[in-house]
């Protein structure tokens, strides 16, 4: 049991490090609220962050298997992002976290 907990802790640590990066949860929240494919500019506008930060976080989410990136051969280039099945599986946990944050915001106002 201890070995299993140790293995799980390593994976949890990895997830927490990734999710604690600037704007990572914001991007997941925005994409969670609107399951339709989203373009980079729409995510950037809704998250209100720099292009560099959004691009890095989307690349990290894609590398972690939480976001799909689909590029179209258009001029100018069109790229759409969607949540993967793994990210959708995280939705209940993220919803609980976001609900907790909103409830705390109501209490501290």
Spans of features found by a protein language model:
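Basic, amphipathic "hinge/linker" alpha-helix immediately C-terminal to the N-terminal HTH DNA-binding motif
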Residues: 73-94
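Glycine-centered, phosphate/nucleic-acid-interacting loop/turn motifs that mediate DNA/RNA or nucleotide
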Residues: 65
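N-terminal helix-turn-helix DNA-binding core of bacterial DNA-binding proteins
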Residues: 10-53, 74, 80
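Amphipathic alpha-helical dimerization/coiled-coil segments
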Residues: 7-12, 29, 89-109
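Basic amphipathic alpha-helical segments that dock to polyanions
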Residues: 54, 58-62
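Short beta-strand "wing" residues that participate in macromolecule-binding interfaces
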Residues: 69
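N-terminal intrinsically disordered/low-complexity leader segments
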Residues: 1-7
């Amino acid at each position: 049991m201890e070995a299993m907990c140790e293995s799980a802790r390593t994976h949890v640590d990895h997830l927490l490090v990734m999710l604690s990066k600037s704007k990572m949860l914001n991007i997941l929240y925005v994409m969670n609220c609107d399951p339709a494919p989203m373009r980079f500019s729409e995510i950037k506008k809704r998250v209100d962050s720099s292009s560099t930060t959004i691009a890095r976080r989307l690349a990290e989410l894609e590398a972690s298997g939480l976001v799909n990136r689909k590029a179209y051969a258009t001029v100018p280039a069109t790229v759409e992002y969607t949540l993967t099945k793994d990210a959708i599986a995280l939705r209940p946990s993220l919803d609980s976290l976001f609900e907790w944050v909103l409830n705390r915001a109501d209490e501290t106002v």
